């Protein structure tokens, strides 16, 4: 049976299209963003452990792009102030690939499931399950990246040396410096997750990720996944003992949790809890 196209049908379609365009142009409210965050959290908490593990591993490997790009740029450009600025422009590459590719990143999960826990007062064990699987698999993914970079002929020796030097510099900070800088790093990346949840476009999301992750790199703020590849590269390159990795990792993880949960999730929940 042929479909009749009438002026009324076209009018309705035009009105619907105009409404959708208007919604896309409007800035989402905090409540709308929180609803999207909660929706994302429910989806992640329901995923099978194997799916989370593979996604977390992929996220760790992909995050190696950040260390790879900065190490190559540093080897080619040197360590002057201008060279450092240019090198840092490449720092967000790993974050862009992981977040837009929807791989699991531990610091994003300081926002999504915690927001749902605060809202519904449940999902505690599911959140701990998600955290443990993703963190372990993120770290295993960064180890795989480090092994590929250091233990094969994939990279020129000067790039491997640059990667190991960066990792050594990261790991040799004091515990207090690692912890407090990780709070800022966790705050910024959880804020990225919040803002991307309210973005209507891929290009807008990419710009948000790039701008905020650039600040993380420029300020040398600790990130438990982004910097793991460099630190593990230094370990595999025999510049650091294995114990140095774990000495660096625990304050970085703790600081990222405090920054993500305390400075983003709790505050964003607080502004929407009574509405």
Segment roles from a protein language model:
Residues 2-275:
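Alpha-helical transmembrane segments and their helix-helix packing motifs
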């Amino acid at each position: 049976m042929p479909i009749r196209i009438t002026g009324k049908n076209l009018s309705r379609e035009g009105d619907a299209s105009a409404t959708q365009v208007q919604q896309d142009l409007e800035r989402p409210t905090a409540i709308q963003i929180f609803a999207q965050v909660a929706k994302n959290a429910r989806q992640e908490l329901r995923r099978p452990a194997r799916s989370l593990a593979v996604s977390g591993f992929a996220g760790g490997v992909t995050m190696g792009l950040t260390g790879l790009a900065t190490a190559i740029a540093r080897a080619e450009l040197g360590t002057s102030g201008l060279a450092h600025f240019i090198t840092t422009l490449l720092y967000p590459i790993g974050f862009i690939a992981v977040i837009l590719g929807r791989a699991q990143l531990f610091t994003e999960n300081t926002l999504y499931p915690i927001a749902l826990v605060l809202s519904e007062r449940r999902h505690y064990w599911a959140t701990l399950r998600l955290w443990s699987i993703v963190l372990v698999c993120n770290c295993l993914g960064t180890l795989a990246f480090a092994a590929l970079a250091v233990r094969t002929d994939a990279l020129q020796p000067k790039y491997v040396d640059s990667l190991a030097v960066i990792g050594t510099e990261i790991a040799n900070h004091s515990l207090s410096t690692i912890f407090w800088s990780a709070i800022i790093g966790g705050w910024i990346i959880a804020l990225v997750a919040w803002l991307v949840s309210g973005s209507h476009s891929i290009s807008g999301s990419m710009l948000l990720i790039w701008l905020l992750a650039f600040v993380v790199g420029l300020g040398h703020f600790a990130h438990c996944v982004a910097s793991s590849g460099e630190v593990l590269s230094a370990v595999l390159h025999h510049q650091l003992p294995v114990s140095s990795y774990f000495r660096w990792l625990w304050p970085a993880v703790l600081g990222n949790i405090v920054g993500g949960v305390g400075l983003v999730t709790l505050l964003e929940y607080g502004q929407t809890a009574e509405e």
